[in-house]
Amino acid sequence: MPGDHRRIRGPEESQPPQLYAADEEEAPGTRDPTRLRPVYARAGLLSQAKGSAYLEAGGTKVLCAVSGPRQAEGGERGGGPAGAGGEAPAALRGRLLCDFRRAPFAGRRRRAPPGGCEERELALALQEALEPAVRLGRYPRAQLEVSALLLEDGGSALAAALTAAALALADAGVEMYDLVVGCGLSLAPGPAPTWLLDPTRLEEERAAAGLTVALMPVLNQVAGLLGSGEGGLTESWAEAVRLGLEGCQRLYPVLQQSLVRAARRRGAAAQP
């Protein structure tokens, strides 16, 4: 007897799958407010990109790629005298374009369609934090493009994207004043609200306020600040900034080692 190929021939009975997902909850009071999640960084991961970097911070995974410099869109612009250090005048400075995308499988909850308002806001924050560190005057009439892809959102996604993007720019050989290191913070609610460094996704969802700090560690200059929510008095926000800057300084050696390892791999590959 011929079978009916138009029907789904599944089993007559089914059983619900067992859930073995890791429990991200922490017992109240056991969380060290200054702890950083384990970090793994690798530069030069993509062979087809001018520069690339992959970063893991706990459950957060970000992949960044850099392309360019290439001629900026909009045609030729008029010339002018060169500035100090051989840089182009302000009117001819290069441009830094940033794109932030979230993979469909990045989080448990369904997100807005790609290219939505949230992704555009994060891309703009990425651009504003990276621009102070890049010597755009050395790339007249050109544009550099940075693409960040969030593979898994385990918390502090913007901070991880900032760090990975700066690492990718350095891997591409782009002239920079300094690297940019990002750190996220969240204000845990309760009778005695406490700022938590490098929060997880669940900690961000429960937080009364959030803050992302971007630091150029060698120059000791803040490249960007982005806060939201109700963080209380000014002293509370100042404490959060101080905690975030300390976290950025602690992450900086990890990026240095990643760039050194990438340079050694390139040197070994270039040898006959």
From Swiss-Prot:
GO molecular function, one term: RNA binding
InterPro entries on file: ExoRNase_PH_dom1, ExoRNase_PH_dom2_sf, PNPase/RNase_PH_dom_sf, Ribosomal_Su5_D2-typ_SF, RNase_PH
Main location (coarse class): cytoplasm
A cellular-component GO term for this protein: exosome (RNase complex)
Superkingdom of source: Eukaryota
Disulfide bonds: none
Alphabetic keyword roster: Cytoplasm, Exosome, Nucleus, RNA-binding, rRNA processing
GO biological process per UniProt: DNA deamination; isotype switching; nuclear mRNA surveillance; poly(A)-dependent snoRNA 3'-end processing; positive regulation of isotype switching; RNA catabolic process; RNA processing; rRNA catabolic process
Database matches in CDD domains: RNase_PH_MTR3
Compartments reported by the entry: Cytoplasm; Nucleus, Nucleolus; Nucleus
Coiled-coil boundaries: none
Stretches for region Disordered: 1-36
Function (record text): Non-catalytic component of the RNA exosome complex which has 3'->5' exoribonuclease activity and participates in a multitude of cellular RNA processing and degradation events. In the nucleus, the RNA exosome complex is involved in proper maturation of stable RNA species such as rRNA, snRNA and snoRNA, in the elimination of RNA processing by-products and non-coding 'pervasive' transcripts, such as antisense RNA species and promoter-upstream transcripts (PROMPTs), and of mRNAs with processing defects, thereby limiting or excluding their export to the cytoplasm.
Family listed: Belongs to the RNase PH family.
Subunit structure: Component of the RNA exosome core complex (Exo-9), composed of EXOSC1, EXOSC2, EXOSC3, EXOSC4, EXOSC5, EXOSC6, EXOSC7, EXOSC8 and EXOSC9; within the complex interacts with EXOSC1, EXOSC7 and EXOSC8. The catalytically inactive Exo-9 may associate with the catalytic subunit EXOSC10/RRP6. Exo-9 may associate with DIS3 to form the nucleolar exosome complex, or DIS3L to form the cytoplasmic exosome complex. Exo-9 is formed by a hexameric base ring consisting of the heterodimers EXOSC4-EXOSC9, EXOSC5-EXOSC8 and EXOSC6-EXOSC7, and a cap ring consisting of EXOSC1, EXOSC2 and EXOSC3.
Protein name: Exosome complex component MTR3
Organismal lineage: Eukaryota, Metazoa, Chordata, Craniata, Vertebrata
